[in-house]
């Protein structure tokens, strides 16, 4: 995806403050949102579920941080412990 394509996607998804205002329907738009959100996490740091939720709540306004957390995990952008108590940015 080029920078221009990414900018076009975000025109209707993100407000001027960088807050995601809606969850997109198209797969490539969802991926762009997830890649944007993962930049809000520090690599190498471990986060509690509460911390992950707080970060996601800060960067979206449509009220479904659980969806975003699941999507980040399902798309291999974050990893977690089996008991879901700790999360971290997936590193390849």
Residue ranges and their predicted role:
Residues 1-5:
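N-terminal regulatory modules of eukaryotic gene-expression and nucleic-acid-associated proteins
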Residues 7-43:
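Short alpha-helical segments that sit at the start of domains
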Residues 35-38, 53-57:
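Amphipathic alpha-helical segments within well-ordered protein domains
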Residues 43-56:
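Short acidic, hydrophobic short linear motifs in intrinsically disordered regions
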Residues 59-71:
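Short amphipathic alpha-helical interaction segments
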Residues 73-74, 89:
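Beta-rich nucleic-acid/ligand-interaction surfaces
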Residues 74-83:
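A short, conserved structural fragment
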Residues 84-92:
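Short, cationic-aromatic polyanion-contact patches
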């Amino acid at each position: 995806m080029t920078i221009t394509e990414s900018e076009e996607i975000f025109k209707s998804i993100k407000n001027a403050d960088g807050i995601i205002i809606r969850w997109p329907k198209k797969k490539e738009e969802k991926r762009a949102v997830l890649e944007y959100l993962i930049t809000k996490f520090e690599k190498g740091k471990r986060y509690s579920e509460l911390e992950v939720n707080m970060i996601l709540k800060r960067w979206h306004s449509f009220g479904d941080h659980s969806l975003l957390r699941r999507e980040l995990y399902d798309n291999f952008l974050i990893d977690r412990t089996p008991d879901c108590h700790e999360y971290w940015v997936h590193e390849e």
